[in-house]
């Protein structure tokens, strides 16, 4: 970052300074960098990246109050839609991992969504469903129709808040203007299919998902379309969409969502051998990815990890009812 925006002699001067800084002790280097970033902040108060760099340096010193003040600046500046999503993501992840910092930041900005979403994701990836739902609820996850909307809906199901899930989906149906956007339509289709919601007609799910796929045929959009077709009883179309999703670019673990729905679709079509094969393949993939250490995160986005848990429960209950009835193993958050 020291060399950004500098040219010629100025860049060479900064290069020399950088080499000198590397020779300092870690503590002195930290202090030098904090001071240098402070000068840069004075020149441009509106650069969240610089605030974030300095916040991390304060964290290294365990200067929690100073770090919290800088993270608050990052949060405030992140309200600008032009700010890179990577900045928001970094702030969410870093705040969630440091309780001392998180506490101070939410005291300063109790209504900011970034800290709560970050900790909700942190907890969801450790299968701490109830704690995660509580955090997402603080973030107003339905204000905009995003992956956080889906995550909160899924967490409501995982914590047996079926009424809350149904109300969320009923509210989505009324947001016609928002749902003209392909991404919002995808989120709505996925959200209301995962239950599925009784408040939404199955053909409406297909319409929303199709709207998204018309704009882009990414694997995750096709997954939502396949699930919507399955909910509407269009089994062959569901299978075709899910197989097309499997052929696209998506992480193997994420594609296990396709496998679980394919298992249910083949089961509903009377093809039990195929259903068992898809279910076995998907569950093995999930089990291989699940961290053995419960304090470690699953290697997925929070919304995908939530979807995998819900779809697995449903598929196993449908295809292996005796196994699920006999199993008394608690979920990791129960």
Residue ranges, per PLM feature:
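TPR/TPR-like (Sel1-like) alpha-helical repeat modules
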Residues: 1-6, 68-80, 140-144, 157-175, ...
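TPR-repeat structural position
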Residues: 27-30, 64, 129, 162, ...
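TPR alpha-solenoid repeat register
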Residues: 50, 83-84, 115, 148-149, ...
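"A position-specific structural signal for the A-helix of alpha-solenoid helical repeats
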Residues: 14-17, 21, 53, 87, ...
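Residue at a conserved register position within TPR or TPR-like alpha-solenoid repeats
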Residues: 19-22, 58, 92, 123, ...
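Short coil turns that delineate tetratricopeptide repeat
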Residues: 45, 79, 110, 143-144, ...
